[in-house]
Amino acid sequence: MINNINRIKKTYNTFLNVNKLRYSTSIISSNILENDNNNIDDFEQVLKSTKVRMPTSALLLPKKPKVCIGMSGGVDSTITAKLLKLQGFDVTGVFIKSWDEVEDTGRCQGERDWKDALEASNFLDIPMYKADFVKDYWNRVFVDFLKDYKNGLTPNPDVWCNREIKFDLFFDFAKENFGVDYIATGHYSNLYYGEENVGDNNNNNLQLHRAIDKNKDQTFFLCMTKGERLKQAIFPIGGFTKENIVSFAKTIPNFSKITSKKSSRGICFIGKRPLPDFLSQYMTLKPGDFFDISTNSFIKGKKHKGSVCYTMGQKANIDSLSERYFIVRSDIERNIVYVCPESQFDQFSLYYEFNTHSFNWINEIPTEVKSEQGFKGRGICRHRGDVVNLTIKDTGKTSPIDGSVIYSVNLDQPLRSVASGQILCLFDRNTDRCFGGGVINSSPLYNPTQF
């Protein structure tokens, strides 16, 4: 048991020692836990000795910083709060409400999550509050979500929720109401603050890096958040694996409920509902035809529920066909959804290039971006997606959407079904550093010539 604990400490300390090299990173084995024989005292020892990275200006504070943590009632934010509490931080918990589930569905998972968060905060002996951002979420995230779908795009509202709510309004709320120095979340990601000038409000030394647990890494959801806002945050569990966090929680009897909760997947406010059922509450959906590009004909007797509901790459779910069919393209104007058999799908779905706009550079823009050769990095286009080598270059053109710079992106290996409206998360070629992200604008690989 002692050896097991020492291995956890050694792994995390190795991760921290890497930070002494200005911006280096290292991939560390996540095969740390092999049994569940450890007790709460053992794991508390690990949490107490795990140093939390903070800006160097925090060292000038007369005592440990005052931190407000967003608590969801899940295991990640709960263990994050416990870690901070054990290390003497002045911790306040806030449950962020951004969606009115009762009005939307008549059910309320959010209230159950609130009760779980409240129970956890009571056990941890930290004050707990609820912040209502429902109207703000509607105006700053959901309205654009609906508009994008109406225009045939594939938005990711969770990315924009982080940018607009969790790392913008939430920090302002916490600062105004509780006078906090920083906010904390249970994100699996890492921030490197570098050598900062005290009193300097720029973020020239801030860097966002992937978590050591690549399967749970959430940097993708943070890549569109502005650097000056990330500078106000700390991510205490980015150096742990999900397995570590769950094992910590299992040693605490009061936390047994949260360890059995499933991680949320998909768009948070849609839940398990089919997308057409959800969108039909907010826009008029018109049934239409499926067009089979392998036979160059419409599929008789089969109707879709509205072309705005279908995204390139998803299963078409058309029954009574000889093989599985996939969405190739949705024509919003004609209300036609183009599909093809799985056996032919690659020729209409593999992308080697696309453009991005509205790019969010967390820190400085690499000088190579404006060179003829471009900047050679890596990228992903969806959470847990394939990480591929790429070259990104400033085209010298601006987007008609918002006047932002258009960047061309060329991939060394193709990515499947890169839809407009999705997000490109840009990484360094050789490290886990995230430079930021941009909104994808891709051209369909299939252009119909007849109907």
From Swiss-Prot:
Site residues (Interaction with tRNA), renumbered to this chain: H187, Q422
Domain of life: Eukaryota
Main location: mitochondrion
One Pfam assignment: tRNA_Me_trans
Any one GO MF annotation of this record: ATP binding
Cell compartments where the protein resides: Mitochondrion
Catalytic activity, as annotated: 5-taurinomethyluridine(34) in tRNA + S-sulfanyl-L-cysteinyl-[protein] + AH2 + ATP = 5-taurinomethyl-2-thiouridine(34) in tRNA + L-cysteinyl-[protein] + A + AMP + diphosphate + H(+)
Cysteine disulfide partners in this protein: C161-C268
Biological process terms in GO annotation: tRNA wobble position uridine thiolation
GO cellular-component term (any): mitochondrion
SUPFAM superfamilies, per database record: Adenine nucleotide alpha hydrolases-like
InterPro entries assigned to the protein according to its UniProt record, in alphabetical order: MnmA-like (IPR004506), MnmA-like_C (IPR046885), MnmA-like_central (IPR046884), MnmA-like_central_sf (IPR023382), Rossmann-like_a/b/a_fold (IPR014729)
UniProt-annotated stretches for the region Interaction with tRNA: 216-218, 386-387
Residues binding ATP: G70, M71, S72, G73, G74, V75, D76, S77, G186
Entry keywords, A to Z: ATP-binding, Disulfide bond, Mitochondrion, Nucleotide-binding, RNA-binding, Transferase, tRNA processing, tRNA-binding
Enzyme Commission code: 2.8.1.14
Function, as annotated: Catalyzes the 2-thiolation of uridine at the wobble position (U34) of mitochondrial tRNA(Lys), tRNA(Glu) and tRNA(Gln). Required for the formation of 5-taurinomethyl-2-thiouridine (tm5s2U) of mitochondrial tRNA(Lys), tRNA(Glu), and tRNA(Gln) at the wobble position. ATP is required to activate the C2 atom of the wobble base.
PANTHER family (alphabetical): MITOCHONDRIAL TRNA-SPECIFIC 2-THIOURIDYLASE 1, TRNA 5-METHYLAMINOMETHYL-2-THIOURIDYLATE -METHYLTRANSFERASE
Miscellaneous section: During the reaction, ATP is used to activate the C2 atom of U34 by adenylation. After this, the persulfide sulfur on the catalytic cysteine is transferred to the C2 atom of the wobble base (U34) of mitochondrial tRNA(Lys), tRNA(Glu) and tRNA(Gln). The reaction probably involves hydrogen sulfide that is generated from the persulfide intermediate and that acts as a nucleophile towards the activated C2 atom on U34. Subsequently, a transient disulfide bond is formed between the two active site cysteine residues.
Family note: Belongs to the MnmA/TRMU family.
Protein's recorded name: Mitochondrial tRNA-specific 2-thiouridylase 1
Species: Dictyostelium discoideum
Gene this protein is translated from: trmu
